[in-house]
């Protein structure tokens, strides 16, 4: 984010104040950029494992993603709490309504909803059992519900970092959890259009494009996706 680049000013004004930089998800290139932007070249770097062995990853391509997601939920999580991520607000609303019609408690969450509605839906998700929250990426920051048993993506995430961060909201209690995703060509075209229409400079757009291509590569992989996911963050699967 552009604002982060201005943080170096604090060090220039207060050079004797100790600093620490923390991030939950960053590949090597991003870590190098953080170090450079914050002028932390002499700092020590500590990296914990990215592996979440209790999460099972599944990625599905094909028609009728909504029906395939419903089959996944019914077969694996008929009474469990979960998160369904969608790319657009319209898709969030439609998916929450559809899941409700199927008999599940499904609540929408996106930035276009009134704040009181977002807070109410968030609190119900945190306090009640078996609630499914259907959301854009506006949902999740600071949310800590240990017993989320599944995270489903009905839209392709924009990067592996985003995918890892969003799926990482499942199974925080250490118990088995599922990360399920459906994707299609339209998702790729939509995300590319978003990137092309953004106000970012061309260098940033190239980085975002490369991240999307890496995400697409993970989807199309026929080998172990956990191994590829860890490899993206420069970690070998033991």
Residue spans for each PLM region:
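Helicase motor core with emphasis on the C-terminal RecA-like subdomain
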Residues: 1-202, 207-210, 234-238
């Amino acid at each position: 984010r552009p604002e982060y680049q201005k943080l170096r000013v604090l060090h220039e004004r207060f050079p004797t104040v100790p600093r620490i930089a923390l991030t939950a998800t960053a590949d090597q290139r991003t870590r190098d950029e953080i170090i450079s932007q914050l002028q932390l070249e002499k700092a020590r770097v500590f990296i914990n494992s990215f592996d979440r062995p209790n999460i099972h990853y599944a990625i599905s391509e094909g028609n009728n993603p909504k029906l395939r997601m419903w089959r996944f939920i019914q077969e694996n999580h008929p009474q469990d709490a979960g998160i369904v991520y969608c790319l657009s607000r319209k898709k969030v609303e439609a998916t929450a309504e559809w899941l409700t019609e199927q008999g599940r408690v499904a609540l929408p969450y996106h930035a276009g909803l009134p704040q009181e509605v977002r807070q109410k839906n968030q609190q119900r998700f945190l306090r009640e059992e078996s609630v499914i929250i259907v959301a854009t990426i506006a949902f999740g920051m600071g949310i800590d519900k240990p017993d989320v048993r599944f995270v489903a993506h009905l839209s392709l995430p924009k990067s592996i970092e985003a995918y890892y961060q969003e799926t990482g909201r499942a199974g925080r209690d250490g118990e088995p959890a599922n990360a399920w995703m459906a994707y299609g060509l339209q998702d790729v075209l939509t995300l590319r259009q978003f990137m092309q229409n953004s106000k970012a400079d061309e260098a940033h757009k190239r980085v975002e494009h490369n991240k999307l291509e890496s995400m697409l590569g993970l989807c199309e992989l026929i080998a172990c996706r956990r191994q590829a996911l860890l490899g993206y963050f420069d970690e070998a699967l033991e």
